[in-house]
Swiss-Prot record:
One of its GO terms (biological process) is peptide pheromone export. Changing residue 1093 to R: 15% mating activity. Changing residue 392 to V: 0.8% mating activity. Belongs to the ABC transporter superfamily. Alpha-factor sex pheromone exporter (TC 3.A.1.206) family. Degraded via the ubiquitin system. This is Alpha-factor-transporting ATPase. It comes from Saccharomyces cerevisiae (strain ATCC 204508 / S288c). The keyword rRNA-binding does not apply. It is an enzyme of class 7 (translocase). Its EC number is 7.4.2.7. CDD domains: ABC_6TM_Pgp_ABCB1_D1_like (cd18577), ABC_6TM_Pgp_ABCB1_D2_like (cd18578).
Amino acid sequence: MNFLSFKTTKHYHIFRYVNIRNDYRLLMIMIIGTVATGLVPAITSILTGRVFDLLSVFVANGSHQGLYSQLVQRSMAVMALGAASVPVMWLSLTSWMHIGERQGFRIRSQILEAYLEEKPMEWYDNNEKLLGDFTQINRCVEELRSSSAEASAITFQNLVAICALLGTSFYYSWSLTLIILCSSPIITFFAVVFSRMIHVYSEKENSETSKAAQLLTWSMNAAQLVRLYCTQRLERKKFKEIILNCNTFFIKSCFFVAANAGILRFLTLTMFVQGFWFGSAMIKKGKLNINDVITCFHSCIMLGSTLNNTLHQIVVLQKGGVAMEKIMTLLKDGSKRNPLNKTVAHQFPLDYATSDLTFANVSFSYPSRPSEAVLKNVSLNFSAGQFTFIVGKSGSGKSTLSNLLLRFYDGYNGSISINGHNIQTIDQKLLIENITVVEQRCTLFNDTLRKNILLGSTDSVRNADCSTNENRHLIKDACQMALLDRFILDLPDGLETLIGTGGVTLSGGQQQRVAIARAFIRDTPILFLDEAVSALDIVHRNLLMKAIRHWRKGKTTIILTHELSQIESDDYLYLMKEGEVVESGTQSELLADPTTTFSTWYHLQNDYSDAKTIVDTETEEKSIHTVESFNSQLETPKLGSCLSNLGYDETDQLSFYEAIYQKRSNVRTRRVKVEEENIGYALKQQKNTESSTGPQLLSIIQIIKRMIKSIRYKKILILGLLCSLIAGATNPVFSYTFSFLLEGIVPSTDGKTGSSHYLAKWSLLVLGVAAADGIFNFAKGFLLDCCSEYWVMDLRNEVMEKLTRKNMDWFSGENNKASEISALVLNDLRDLRSLVSEFLSAMTSFVTVSTIGLIWALVSGWKLSLVCISMFPLIIIFSAIYGGILQKCETDYKTSVAQLENCLYQIVTNIKTIKCLQAEFHFQLTYHDLKIKMQQIASKRAIATGFGISMTNMIVMCIQAIIYYYGLKLVMIHEYTSKEMFTTFTLLLFTIMSCTSLVSQIPDISRGQRAASWIYRILDEKHNTLEVENNNARTVGIAGHTYHGKEKKPIVSIQNLTFAYPSAPTAFVYKNMNFDMFCGQTLGIIGESGTGKSTLVLLLTKLYNCEVGKIKIDGTDVNDWNLTSLRKEISVVEQKPLLFNGTIRDNLTYGLQDEILEIEMYDALKYVGIHDFVISSPQGLDTRIDTTLLSGGQAQRLCIARALLRKSKILILDECTSALDSVSSSIINEIVKKGPPALLTMVITHSEQMMRSCNSIAVLKDGKVVERGNFDTLYNNRGELFQIVSNQSS
């Protein structure tokens, strides 16, 4: 057979990443060990022939005199060979696995480098299946590793063995060997044809799996949106359709795999028939003796067995080839090594601090949208050491400026220069070292808060000992400047608190403050702030802007903003519109001309009532004093007393840094105030009930029981197992008929061999048994593969169904990362297929063969059988020890793989932030540390696997040697005839082979065992992790006409509400809160950070349960509402807009149950002021959205339009204007002012303009409503609302 054809695909072979220079020692050991191991079967054949040659001597002499000693020596030679093969085979397999691991790590490093260094930003923009391909590529790495390790080891050992066996067979009789192997061309033909079909369908299955991974990852990342829009069924339906395609392609692949196996078994078993005829004739003619014939037959039998064993490995090699093709496509697709340094002329540092920054006639279109000009002949000049503002509508091209400045995109017209030097001639690393960009959509990583803050620093600071005074002061200054100090003091572990999954989830405002702290530590000459404080409340926003002005005095600072009040009179600004600069000048100059667009926008945003002119002088003075005393100690009532109130000042023995760095176990638990600008973002300290290593592994018996209980086609499973039983039974039957053929060529005492009639009869029987064997092996392989695939498909769908029913708190669990669950469901579950298709089959065959074979052997020759049976406890004990060791190794290995892939997932999903912060080295270091840990575990696994396989082989050869010795001895003492000996011997040999094939399944079983345990962990988790549905719940919607009468009744009523998050049960968000909301209200929910504004949305939509007190909607307790019916009545627009990579139409109609007219979509788009953007897009509503390139304002307005199209009775806007420009904000403000098409509109906001648009205000503080009324009244009362709006702190 052409083995190499199975290890190549196109130009990429699976050993592409073997480095001969570095691996030559390992390769030498591997080659020597492989050759030596491959020679073992041939040597065994020779030794076996020598053993049975004593039989012909005994028959010829009629006496056993002098034969015992030779029998002992020749039998023990087989045993000695088995013992000698242990270290050789162990070294060989271990070295092969090490080669595979080295290849795997090199490929992972190449993938890391490709993601971090080589892929341009346009590649990320164009890749719609980024996360799906990410999941798939991780599986490909593992398949390639497996194919170049265990599979290649076995294949090449078998290849050596085949060559050696052929050589041995040819040596003893070339003519007999050629006769036996005359059917090999047919075998090769079928193998090649079927392998090509397997390759085709494997590729198709991988492609569909990638789509499924993309969908699953998105649905987990957008879990809140999926629940609010009641699209769980839609997501499950889409997932089910993709998984069904995976199922179809895999089953077609299985058909060809099973057909190949069945035909190969039939042909290899039947190729001996012609050999027996020829061998018998040669013996009769005296041209061959029995030793020659037995040696040839044994060699060819082992050759056929070797080919059968290689078949499964060839399939693995094919998958490895497909995997390599996929990996190389990823590495080569769009990759440009150092793409932005092609014309580097100046790699010396410029004096950025005194350099002007200039955009000259710059025009640009994103590569993914070449027909849409984002910038049109833009010319800008940013003076060194000055503050410059850029304002403009959402989508006007403001954010694109920073992308071009940092050279994330190339191919623009015009020039960008620093101090006259074109940035194309400046090393990109130098640019990023001297320019910091803080994005509106800032990113935090799943790490400690300290590491997140230091991520913006130089490598020396980031990795330095944080106990040094210099770094302590650096952290302290950054936290104080970014207004983080009080928040950090309230965290459970201070700066060492884990952020993200498994730890604390920060709100949008807190994330932005961490991003500002990063920028402070970097302190680069040029700072680019892109809506960097938009998510903050008024108090923190204004304080932070003043702090930024103090910090950046004399440094080049460019601020992109929609908040025009941040611009001072002498600040220079540019106003952009539709990619062009339409106005420029200082604020005072532009305001002096009432015809300017800026003047119109400014007055539009600042068109307040006379109450706004009421300014508390004392408040202003405090604000000024705050900035002036920034470097010493913050003195505002909000922050200045933070340290002193807690007993920390400069004279304390416990410094501020120590207070926030260490967990304050001596401080009594108190309420943690958390900003809640985003729905569902609250402080949630995860309390894991499981260790980080995951759930306890289920036993094989438990998994099989659950499989049998849940498998879809039980009849097919039974039929498959029945075919497996019959296929298993054909082995001893074949052995039995085969023994008669052997008997036919052994000369009797009169020197005669079997007659032609005798050989013809048993030859036909052998052919019949071989045909039955091939048919039933095909049937059991195909049927069980189908059953296993349907089981896996059903498990995937069950998991998806469970994921869409999980409550929101579940997604913050440490073991519930989207990337990890996606890999588990789409990748690791493949390993579970082998439990049905291979383990159950092997177990059934083993039980059948053992039962039938051993009973038959006992009947045929009980003495020899009992000797063999006495060896079985050795196999059982060893299998148990080997299985236990390998199970731990496999579990640890998979866990380490998951950790490595989670690190890579963070890189892929946050690549722009990493590049902006020059954090590549940090992530490379983190990745390297995880890789070292994984290498250590992989090494242990390689040693354990090599040990297990080599010891199994030794045990088999030892048992074989004992059977040889005792069987021939029984013949020599006339207790057995040669026929009885051959019959018993072949039956026992096939039984042992079946047993060892079961042991060889242990690595696959261990992998499948882990996958099943983790999957059933998700399926079996406690009921409190699911959203609970009340069977008798209300399904009737809110009837609007019932609120038009004279009697005024609340549409929402909150009564004695007390609530704390399950993860922080002692930190009460609400304490006995009461208030009502009425039809026709546009109710503004106002409060400082941490007062529970967004938590109210979570309770109204029942994303969290209300257990103390009541929330009634339309007179019905939310706990008595049907979840879907309730959420259909409420539309929520989140602060962070969430869209998916699809058309504008698909995003607008997401979650809608009824058909909607196109004109209604356009009306909604006009309503929110984004109609022009949509109609100017290439395909209008059918234009595909690139979520990474839409501006925050554009995405937010699409989300508002989507919410309006739902026509819900209650509309909730959660900081929905934070990303909008003044014109767009005014449009939304006007909508709110006039009253959106809803019975009740709730507006959570920090914007004064939005507050004034509401006809009613509710102010929250300390878990209660402290003020109710309209804005003007509450403002003039100088109460809590006045303090929030005017920056006065209580």
